[in-house]
Amino acid sequence: AIKKITDETSNMGYAFVDVSPRIKKIGDNKVEVTFEIQEGTKIFIDRINISGNVKTNDDVIRRELTFVEGDAYNSSKIKESERHIRGTGLFDNIEIKIDEMVGTNKTEVDVGVTERSTGQFTVGAGFSSLDGAIGSIGIKESNLFGEAKELSLNLGLSTRKSEIDLSFTDPYFLNKDLAAGIDIFNIRRNQKTYSGYKHNIIGFKLRTGFEIIDNLRYFSSYTLKRDKIHDIDNDTSIYIQAQEGKRVTSVIGQALQYDELNDRINPTDGYRVRFDVDYFGLGGDSEHILTELKIAN
């Protein structure tokens, strides 16, 4: 009860509150509890200090804060801001402290972070009955230029397949709460030896997303790809021969996602629910609707 009262008064701007319970016996089995609250002075945020961000720009952290200089102190917004910063996936530790300015009704808020490694380099090798010997290289940076932008490049090469994927995401496109990104891909598969044909895929995907309310985001996308099956042998299966030529796939995607996970990269608590609807058509060679529901915890 004391903590709840303290939290509620803190949300009203009283950062330094003293709550004292007074217990009075009023019967054999009853007591009366009175809480005496000393609110003190209403506190306002004078300055926000950011520290520990060696690579990351201050703006990346500040835009996740739900309070600004001049606001009344609010403990709920402090906790919410910490969760938002953690949700970027750029930091191992986040600590927000208040530093009372003695003799005034103002306080400084110190936001301290410990950056995590955001660059990744992966190399893989293996064997597949479909593609033969496989090798892959992946490069990814999740904090490009210290602006939380994400860039990744994946290259795959095998005996019968080559693949390249390039992806870029800006979580605050045009300095607005609008994530935007693009994926470009090209896949070439040579199945002449075993199946008597070649298959090429080339295309791109445009992505956007924004927050509707806290934790609920809307996503939209447009995908355009071209499949080409060619160089077919005469003895190839009738099924493959029927697919010879070029096919265009055009997809408009929409999704709603509610995310309560406590960390985007390594979550330890919470859950995520996402509902996707993809509309195939819009000039493509296939027309149908695909829906998908995903739940993770």
Question: Which residues make up each language-model segment?
Answer:
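Short glycine/proline-enriched turns and hinge-like loops at secondary-structure junctions
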Residues: 267-270, 285-290
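Gram-negative/organellar outer-membrane beta-barrel architecture
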Residues: 74-274
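Polybasic, low-complexity association/targeting segments
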Residues: 83-85, 287, 292
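Interaction-mediating elements
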Residues: 1-88, 93-113, 118
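Intrinsically disordered or highly flexible coil/loop and linker segments, enriched in small
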Residues: 10-15, 217-221, 265, 284
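A generic structural motif
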Residues: 190, 279-283
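A translation/RNA-centric and nucleic-acid-associated enzymatic feature enriched
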Residues: 296
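Amphipathic hydrophobic-ligand
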Residues: 14-18, 135, 160, 201, ...
